[in-house]
Design a protein with these regions (language model features):
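Flexible, polar/low-complexity N-terminal or interdomain linker segments that lie immediately upstream
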Residues: 1-35, 63, 149-153, 158-162
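Short hydrophobic beta-strand that contains or immediately precedes a catalytic carboxylate
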Residues: 20-24, 37-40, 184-185, 234
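Aromatic- and Gly/Pro-rich amphipathic surface segment
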Residues: 47-84
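Catalytic cysteine-centered active loop of the rhodanese-like fold, especially the PTP/DSP P-loop
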Residues: 69-97, 104-137
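Glycine-rich phosphate-binding P-loop
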Residues: 117-119, 159-178
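A short glycine-rich beta-strand->turn/loop micro-motif centered on a GG-aromatic cluster
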Residues: 132-145, 185-190
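Conserved nucleotide-sensing/catalytic segment adjacent to the nucleotide-binding pocket
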Residues: 178-253
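Conserved NTP phosphate-binding and transfer environment spanning the P-loop NTPase/kinase superfamily
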Residues: 253-260, 264-368
């Protein structure tokens, strides 16, 4: 068998069926990688640094010799690691009793490094020699990043799910997905709910690059399978910044030009929902979050909110915060183009997911 170098589109098609091995260093992988790829580093972070220094300060041949020293002692363990991985994947597929062709049924392996150079070529040679059928990505991870960024420039049929803070928009999105609708949960991809309090109860945020990769993969799934229910993708209304991350500029501009179905829920109902959702968190992280917005909230309101928090009067604390976020959200709505055309308000009596979805879908069908 011979190693085949393939272009990004074919690589992604095969990646839906077969494992992808990222042979870059652990640090490179940790920073960002192709979603779903497995880390099989040819060099450790320190070894990569040594090889790179030799290449720059001595010669290409010297760097290759140092790399071969590192590679030689790892050959057997790398082959065995890939063998074990394939066994685990096949076992998992059998347990899931999948009837689709979405599990590896042979020895096909996809390999990539940063630019599709010597690291992927070396590992691909080894795995091919052992008996695996190996494909490498032309241009490597760098080419994948170019492809990922191109996804954000593509037109997508977005419908924005709007509503003031505390409207339960994420719950609506999740229920829409369970019923077969196409959705993108940006806050889920970002591990952040979007406000100063958005990190509470969430895992650490991915890097900006990894966030973009995750979003690109989600979009690519829609282009591969075709969106359902009229080719519509529901996505929650967001500011461009979600915690420490930014929605890619071209995609965010598409969001701002898309129509909005706005869940208009009474203030007190939303306040009750927020009190229940955030009242479980400790005083210290809540106070830290309040302090982060004190300049915009104002000194008096900040002091009052913290006092209510210390007195365990969460409802009055959140009342102050919710008024602030309502004003903040209204400014964002006002900045949209052709507001009367883009925004359709849907009157809802409470934060109740299923009944609000019924109203949402009715408006979606009847709206021009």
């Amino acid at each position: 068998m011979a190693v085949q170098k393939i272009l990004i589109n074919q690589f992604l098609q095969l990646a839906a069926l077969h494992p992808v091995l990222d042979v870059r260093s652990p640090g490179e992988y940790l920073h960002a990688h192709i979603p779903g790829a497995y880390s099989l580093p040819l060099f450790t972070d320190e070894e990569r640094k040594v090889v790179g220094t030799a290449y720059k300060q001595q010669s290409r041949k010297k760097a290759i010799k140092i790399g071969l020293d590192y590679f030689g002692i790892k050959m057997r363990s790398m082959v065995e690691e890939v063998e074990a991985m394939l066994i685990d994947l096949r076992s998992l597929a059998k347990k899931q009793l999948s009837t689709n062709n979405d599990q590896p049924t042979n020895n096909i392996i996809l390999v990539h490094c940063w630019r599709g150079g010597m690291r992927s070529a070396g590992v691909a040679w080894l795995l091919d020699l052992y008996g695996f059928k190996v494909f490498t990505l032309s241009g490597g991870y760098k080419m994948y990043r170019q492809w990922a960024r191109s996804q954000f420039d593509t037109f997508w049929p977005l419908t924005i799910l709007g509503g003031y803070t505390g409207s339960g928009k994420t719950l609506v999105l999740q229920e829409l997905e369970r019923t077969g609708q196409s959705i993108i949960d940006l806050e889920g991809l970002a591990n952040h709910k979007g406000s100063a309090f958005g990190a509470l109860g969430e895992k650490r945020q991915p890097t900006q690059e990894m966030f973009e990769n995750l979003l690109a993969k989600k979009l690519h799934l829609f282009s591969e399978t075709g969106t359902t229910h009229g080719g519509e993708i529901f996505i929650e209304d967001e500011s461009q910044r979600i915690g420490a991350l930014n929605i890619p500029d071209s995609f965010w501009k598409q969001m701002r030009r898309s129509r909005v179905l706005f869940l208009d829920i009474p203030f007190e109902e939303r306040l009750s929902y927020l009190t229940e959702e955030y009242g479980i968190f400790g005083k210290e992280p809540m106070e830290n979050a309040i302090i982060r917005i004190q300049k915009r909230l104002g000194g008096l309101e900040t002091k009052m909110a913290i006092n209510y928090l210390q007195e365990n009067n969460h409802r009055e604390c959140f009342r102050i915060l919710l008024k602030y976020y309502d004003k903040y959200y209204e400014k964002g709505l006002a900045a949209r183009e052709t507001i009367p055309v883009l925004i359709k308000k849907i009157t809802c009596l409470e934060v109740e997911t299923k009944s609000n979805i019924q109203k949402l879908m009715h408006e979606k069908i009847t709206a021009p």
